[in-house]
């Protein structure tokens, strides 16, 4: 008696054989028309490889193709297949319908026998799914054949393609979203991402210009099929199969191959430089980025104000602030807890003064901000200059408390010097925030507020600020009054202006050179599984994988990773943003602050000698040829020597003297030639203000400010 388990397995085996046989006629049905195709071979072919698994998939869809073919005349052909992910996409993702069969050999005959009264003049969509008739030549060319047949057919098609070439390129242009004859295929291959970004914008224009193309593409969802199909499918076959490679090349330029390649390269470069505003909006919801620097005399309340803004905008949560409050109380520094949000190191917390330039990030409904918290002590002015060189807007914090304002503003205080340095470093808008208005010695007094702002206003106008660029407002950094919400009218009935964040949100937008050549002065460096540099992008934009040059050493580097203000990875960063870039090609010890990352096409200049216009603001004695001091130029700090005093400029008219002056003293404006010992990255002030303005310091004092007029 046979085992019931053996009986069961036999039954199952018989069932699977009969099942296979019942499927087999269905699969082989279309092939019976071909007398030279041997079904037995296919049967023998089944066990050897994975082709059997592939066959049912392909043939079922092929079978479905015949069923749905009748709908092709009704205009529903493309729709049916796009609902399955697109007829052409399915096959392209497998390396192409024709190519799969080519590689297996012998299946191309099956294709050349046109499927049951299928009209050979109407190829089914091809790669683009835009113009079935125009793709006829491309389809037949891609089919498997010997090299000799291929070359013969290529020659025939080139002759036949000469006439309709113009029509073809125009049609293709609409699918790739680029209006350039003969270059469309090249650009798709070279820049798939660019074609995706560019495709939405021109669609509307071309829809009205080409009604035919519009009709054909109506059944196809615009976003899903044309552009991505080209972008996704083009790279795959080029790498895997050898047959289509020459066909793509021959199709791209039937009229003049060399002209086409040149224009395609030019277009690719153009596209690389153009940044679609829509991309910026997509990434940041249309919010632009502003860097603000808190400056002013030591103890004016800069860090406390910065910490409170972070708390009020939700960038620091309540638990963290409460933790700092407990720690500050334990350390006997009860009123300092908000400043601890900004002052993170132990020395800063113990002394209650900022040493480094603190950085923090917050966001409002309208903008993204980076706070640069500059040290107020005169020992750390160099750090403050580095911070000011990266800022868009200066917030000059002054204390209204009796005695503190006077200390900061009088000689030796940092209020004046910080305002001057900010102006020198290109901070053209300054917000004077009168802090500590809630102090018992002040108690929101209008008289005290006016006393502080009037004196300072005269000084600010004297160093070059326009009246419209100076804004005054009373606040309390500790209680938060006037920072996010307006000051309570009960406390301060005489001030009806905006709060600090309200004003910042509604300022005019910054003029960013997003499409300019990329430039980023390096303000800091670190080692973190590679070389990381940080700084503010002064011009242009950068993407992951971009090749740049590090000047002045001319070292080629590649951008591996971009970290934005919130320490998150980003694909792109734009002019005005504070970023950290992980770069390949240079060791951390081989670079220093003051180096500039720049675009290879338009690198920043490097010089050891330049001519500059200089205003001497504070000098104990005089200076003459050979005088040396320290120059702060963007993020670079270099020793500089006066080689030649060329002209003295008259007050008021700025007319040059004919004779060179023998010396220069406080209050004079001169034109001089300066020299540095090592090459430094610089541009003229006229071309790139941020890389063309500098500050001169000697013995801990700012002695002069200047701008580069000529590179020598």
Curated annotation (Swiss-Prot):
Residues 202-217 have a biased composition (Basic and acidic residues). Residues 287-512 form the tr-type G domain. Residues 296-303 are annotated as: G1. Keywords: Cytoplasm, GTP-binding, Nucleotide-binding, Phosphoprotein, Protein biosynthesis, Repeat. Its main location: cytoplasm. PROSITE patterns: G_TR_1, G_TR_2. Residues 373-376 are annotated as: G3. The keyword Repeat applies. The modification Phosphothreonine is found at residue 370. It is found in: Cytoplasm. SUPFAM superfamilies: EF-Tu/eEF-1alpha/eIF2-gamma C-terminal domain, P-loop containing nucleoside triphosphate hydrolases, Translation proteins. Residues 16-143 are annotated as: Several sort of repeats. GO terms for biological process: nuclear-transcribed mRNA catabolic process, deadenylation-dependent decay. Residues 1-64, 76-115, 132-162, 184-256 are annotated as: Disordered. InterPro entries: EFTu-like_2, G_TR_CS, GTP-eEF1A_C, P-loop_NTPase, Sup35, T_Tr_GTP-bd_dom, TRAFAC_GTPase_members, Transl_B-barrel_sf. GO terms for cellular component: cytoplasm. Pfam families: GTP-eEF1A_C, GTP_EFTU, GTP_EFTU_D2. Residues 352-356 are annotated as: G2. GTP binds at residues 296-303, 373-377, 435-438. GO terms for molecular function: GTP binding; GTPase activity; translation release factor activity. Involved in translation termination. Stimulates the activity of ERF1. Binds guanine nucleotides. Belongs to the TRAFAC class translation factor GTPase superfamily. Classic translation factor GTPase family. ERF3 subfamily. This is Eukaryotic peptide chain release factor GTP-binding subunit. It comes from Candida maltosa.
